[in-house]
Amino acid sequence: MIILPPGVDINNLIDDMKSFSWEASDILIKYAQIIKDSNNKSNILTNKNEEDPVTIADLQVNEMMIKNITESYKNINWEILSEENVKIDPNNIRINKDFVWVLDPLDGTKDFIQGTGNYAMHLALNYKNKCYLGLVLIPDKDELWITNHDTIWCENRNEEYTKPNLRIKNNLKDMTIVTSKNHRNQTLQNLIEKVDFKEVIEMGSIGCKIASILRGESDIYICLS
Protein backbone atom coordinates (compact mmCIF):
# COMPACT_ATOMS: atom_id res chain seq x y z
CA MET A 1 0.00 0.00 0.00
CA ILE A 2 1.31 3.43 -0.98
CA ILE A 3 1.07 6.09 1.70
CA LEU A 4 0.99 9.69 0.50
CA PRO A 5 3.23 12.27 2.18
CA PRO A 6 1.91 13.59 5.52
CA GLY A 7 -0.75 16.26 5.05
CA VAL A 8 -1.84 15.04 1.60
CA ASP A 9 -5.32 13.54 1.18
CA ILE A 10 -5.94 11.66 -2.08
CA ASN A 11 -9.45 13.04 -2.62
CA ASN A 12 -8.38 16.64 -2.02
CA LEU A 13 -5.34 16.06 -4.21
CA ILE A 14 -7.48 14.83 -7.11
CA ASP A 15 -9.85 17.78 -6.70
CA ASP A 16 -6.94 20.21 -6.80
CA MET A 17 -5.40 18.60 -9.88
CA LYS A 18 -8.78 18.69 -11.62
CA SER A 19 -9.05 22.41 -10.89
CA PHE A 20 -5.51 23.06 -12.11
CA SER A 21 -6.17 21.00 -15.24
CA TRP A 22 -9.21 23.05 -16.22
CA GLU A 23 -7.16 26.18 -15.69
CA ALA A 24 -4.64 24.69 -18.13
CA SER A 25 -7.50 23.97 -20.52
CA ASP A 26 -8.43 27.65 -20.55
CA ILE A 27 -4.87 28.60 -21.49
CA LEU A 28 -4.59 26.02 -24.25
CA ILE A 29 -7.98 26.84 -25.74
CA LYS A 30 -7.13 30.55 -25.73
CA TYR A 31 -3.94 30.02 -27.72
CA ALA A 32 -5.58 27.46 -30.00
CA GLN A 33 -8.07 30.18 -30.94
CA ILE A 34 -5.27 32.71 -31.43
CA ILE A 35 -3.59 30.29 -33.85
CA LYS A 36 -6.86 29.72 -35.68
CA ASP A 37 -7.43 33.45 -36.09
CA SER A 38 -3.84 34.34 -36.96
CA ASN A 39 -2.13 34.41 -40.34
CA ASN A 40 1.26 34.14 -38.65
CA LYS A 41 1.43 31.11 -36.36
CA SER A 42 5.08 31.83 -35.64
CA ASN A 43 3.91 34.58 -33.28
CA ILE A 44 3.29 32.03 -30.52
CA LEU A 45 6.38 29.89 -31.19
CA THR A 46 9.30 30.29 -28.81
CA ASN A 47 11.78 28.34 -30.93
CA LYS A 48 12.41 27.59 -34.60
CA ASN A 49 12.76 23.80 -34.23
CA GLU A 50 10.19 22.36 -36.63
CA GLU A 51 10.70 18.82 -35.26
CA ASP A 52 10.20 19.82 -31.62
CA PRO A 53 8.37 23.15 -31.50
CA VAL A 54 7.60 24.94 -28.25
CA THR A 55 4.82 27.51 -27.95
CA ILE A 56 3.88 30.22 -25.49
CA ALA A 57 1.01 27.93 -24.46
CA ASP A 58 3.50 25.19 -23.43
CA LEU A 59 5.39 27.60 -21.22
CA GLN A 60 2.33 29.24 -19.64
CA VAL A 61 0.74 25.91 -18.73
CA ASN A 62 4.10 24.68 -17.46
CA GLU A 63 4.56 27.74 -15.24
CA MET A 64 0.98 27.70 -13.96
CA MET A 65 0.93 23.99 -13.07
CA ILE A 66 4.27 24.09 -11.26
CA LYS A 67 3.28 27.27 -9.39
CA ASN A 68 -0.11 25.86 -8.33
CA ILE A 69 1.29 22.53 -7.14
CA THR A 70 4.18 24.19 -5.33
CA GLU A 71 2.08 26.84 -3.60
CA SER A 72 -0.79 24.49 -2.71
CA TYR A 73 1.49 21.84 -1.23
CA LYS A 74 4.30 23.67 0.49
CA ASN A 75 6.91 21.62 2.34
CA ILE A 76 5.66 18.35 0.80
CA ASN A 77 8.45 15.89 0.10
CA TRP A 78 8.06 15.49 -3.66
CA GLU A 79 9.58 16.92 -6.82
CA ILE A 80 8.25 18.14 -10.16
CA LEU A 81 9.80 16.92 -13.40
CA SER A 82 8.60 18.91 -16.40
CA GLU A 83 9.39 18.26 -20.05
CA GLU A 84 9.84 21.97 -20.70
CA ASN A 85 12.24 22.38 -17.77
CA VAL A 86 14.27 19.42 -19.01
CA LYS A 87 14.53 21.06 -22.44
CA ILE A 88 15.71 24.33 -20.88
CA ASP A 89 18.35 22.81 -18.59
CA PRO A 90 18.81 19.06 -19.19
CA ASN A 91 22.06 18.93 -17.21
CA ASN A 92 20.52 20.28 -14.02
CA ILE A 93 17.87 17.63 -13.41
CA ARG A 94 18.35 15.73 -10.15
CA ILE A 95 15.52 13.49 -8.96
CA ASN A 96 16.03 11.89 -5.55
CA LYS A 97 12.53 11.76 -4.07
CA ASP A 98 10.14 8.79 -3.99
CA PHE A 99 7.19 10.94 -5.11
CA VAL A 100 7.70 12.80 -8.38
CA TRP A 101 5.23 14.79 -10.45
CA VAL A 102 5.80 14.30 -14.19
CA LEU A 103 4.33 17.03 -16.40
CA ASP A 104 4.02 17.46 -20.15
CA PRO A 105 2.13 20.75 -20.50
CA LEU A 106 1.37 20.28 -24.19
CA ASP A 107 1.67 16.90 -25.88
CA GLY A 108 0.95 17.04 -29.60
CA THR A 109 2.39 20.50 -30.21
CA LYS A 110 2.46 20.03 -33.98
CA ASP A 111 -1.24 19.18 -34.02
CA PHE A 112 -1.87 22.13 -31.71
CA ILE A 113 -0.21 24.43 -34.23
CA GLN A 114 -1.98 22.73 -37.15
CA GLY A 115 -5.35 23.23 -35.43
CA THR A 116 -6.46 19.57 -35.43
CA GLY A 117 -7.58 19.57 -31.78
CA ASN A 118 -5.47 16.48 -31.07
CA TYR A 119 -3.37 17.83 -28.23
CA ALA A 120 -3.33 17.16 -24.50
CA MET A 121 -1.76 17.95 -21.16
CA HIS A 122 -0.30 14.99 -19.28
CA LEU A 123 0.26 14.95 -15.52
CA ALA A 124 1.25 12.04 -13.30
CA LEU A 125 2.31 11.55 -9.71
CA ASN A 126 4.80 8.69 -9.66
CA TYR A 127 5.89 6.72 -6.63
CA LYS A 128 9.26 5.04 -7.10
CA ASN A 129 8.92 5.33 -10.89
CA LYS A 130 5.41 3.86 -11.03
CA CYS A 131 2.28 5.90 -11.71
CA TYR A 132 0.12 6.46 -8.63
CA LEU A 133 -2.14 9.21 -10.01
CA GLY A 134 -2.53 10.20 -13.66
CA LEU A 135 -4.46 12.81 -15.61
CA VAL A 136 -4.83 13.43 -19.34
CA LEU A 137 -6.56 16.67 -20.30
CA ILE A 138 -7.99 16.98 -23.83
CA PRO A 139 -9.31 20.56 -24.06
CA ASP A 140 -10.81 20.28 -27.53
CA LYS A 141 -13.14 17.51 -26.32
CA ASP A 142 -13.74 18.95 -22.84
CA GLU A 143 -12.35 15.71 -21.40
CA LEU A 144 -10.24 14.98 -18.34
CA TRP A 145 -9.21 11.33 -18.03
CA ILE A 146 -8.14 10.33 -14.52
CA THR A 147 -6.73 7.24 -12.87
CA ASN A 148 -6.15 6.86 -9.14
CA HIS A 149 -4.22 3.59 -9.78
CA ASP A 150 -7.38 1.57 -9.08
CA THR A 151 -10.00 3.10 -11.37
CA ILE A 152 -10.10 4.98 -14.68
CA TRP A 153 -12.80 7.49 -15.52
CA CYS A 154 -13.43 10.60 -17.60
CA GLU A 155 -15.24 13.77 -16.67
CA ASN A 156 -15.97 17.10 -18.29
CA ARG A 157 -15.84 20.58 -16.79
CA ASN A 158 -19.37 20.11 -15.42
CA GLU A 159 -18.17 16.97 -13.57
CA GLU A 160 -20.29 14.66 -15.72
CA TYR A 161 -18.66 11.23 -15.55
CA THR A 162 -18.19 8.55 -18.19
CA LYS A 163 -16.51 5.16 -17.95
CA PRO A 164 -14.13 3.57 -20.46
CA ASN A 165 -15.83 1.75 -23.32
CA LEU A 166 -13.16 -0.69 -24.45
CA ARG A 167 -13.90 -2.86 -27.46
CA ILE A 168 -12.95 -6.53 -27.12
CA LYS A 169 -11.53 -7.97 -30.34
CA ASN A 170 -9.23 -10.93 -30.83
CA ASN A 171 -8.31 -10.64 -34.50
CA LEU A 172 -5.88 -7.90 -35.52
CA LYS A 173 -7.54 -7.60 -38.92
CA ASP A 174 -10.77 -6.59 -37.17
CA MET A 175 -9.05 -3.86 -35.18
CA THR A 176 -8.71 -0.14 -35.77
CA ILE A 177 -5.19 1.10 -35.10
CA VAL A 178 -4.55 4.65 -33.96
CA THR A 179 -1.17 5.97 -34.99
CA SER A 180 0.90 9.13 -35.15
CA LYS A 181 0.06 11.78 -37.70
CA ASN A 182 3.48 13.43 -37.69
CA HIS A 183 5.95 10.82 -36.42
CA ARG A 184 5.14 7.52 -38.15
CA ASN A 185 8.32 5.80 -39.37
CA GLN A 186 8.72 3.32 -42.22
CA THR A 187 9.01 0.32 -39.89
CA LEU A 188 5.61 1.03 -38.39
CA GLN A 189 4.15 1.73 -41.82
CA ASN A 190 5.39 -1.66 -43.05
CA LEU A 191 3.84 -3.36 -40.01
CA ILE A 192 0.49 -1.65 -40.58
CA GLU A 193 0.45 -2.71 -44.21
CA LYS A 194 1.42 -6.29 -43.36
CA VAL A 195 -1.23 -6.73 -40.67
CA ASP A 196 -3.92 -5.04 -42.79
CA PHE A 197 -5.88 -3.48 -39.95
CA LYS A 198 -9.55 -2.75 -40.50
CA GLU A 199 -8.93 0.99 -40.24
CA VAL A 200 -6.05 3.38 -39.55
CA ILE A 201 -6.73 6.58 -37.60
CA GLU A 202 -4.04 9.25 -37.49
CA MET A 203 -3.79 11.74 -34.65
CA GLY A 204 -1.26 13.56 -32.52
CA SER A 205 -0.60 13.19 -28.78
CA ILE A 206 -0.23 9.81 -27.13
CA GLY A 207 -2.85 10.92 -24.59
CA CYS A 208 -5.37 11.53 -27.37
CA LYS A 209 -4.54 8.13 -28.87
CA ILE A 210 -5.07 6.25 -25.62
CA ALA A 211 -8.27 8.21 -24.97
CA SER A 212 -9.59 7.12 -28.37
CA ILE A 213 -9.07 3.50 -27.28
CA LEU A 214 -10.79 4.15 -23.94
CA ARG A 215 -13.77 5.68 -25.76
CA GLY A 216 -14.03 2.62 -28.01
CA GLU A 217 -13.17 4.55 -31.18
CA SER A 218 -10.02 2.51 -31.82
CA ASP A 219 -8.51 -0.72 -30.52
CA ILE A 220 -4.74 -0.64 -30.57
CA TYR A 221 -1.76 1.72 -30.48
CA ILE A 222 1.76 0.55 -31.34
CA CYS A 223 4.89 2.55 -30.50
CA LEU A 224 8.21 1.39 -31.95
CA SER A 225 10.36 4.26 -30.66
Annotate each PLM feature:
Residues 94-157:
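DPxDG-like acidic metal-binding loop motif
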Residues 166-225:
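An extended, acidic
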Residues 91-92, 112-113, 188-189, 212:
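Short glycine-/acidic-enriched loop or helix-start segments at secondary-structure transitions
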Residues 87, 151, 159, 184, ...:
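Residue-level detector of flexible, active-site-proximal loop/helix-junction positions
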Residues 1-106, 190-194:
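N-terminal subdomain of lithium-sensitive/metallo-dependent phosphomonoesterases centered on the IMPase/IPPase/PAP
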Residues 123, 162-163:
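Active-site glycine-rich loop that binds ribose-phosphate moieties when present
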Residues 24, 28, 58, 69, ...:
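Residue-level signal for inorganic ion chemistry
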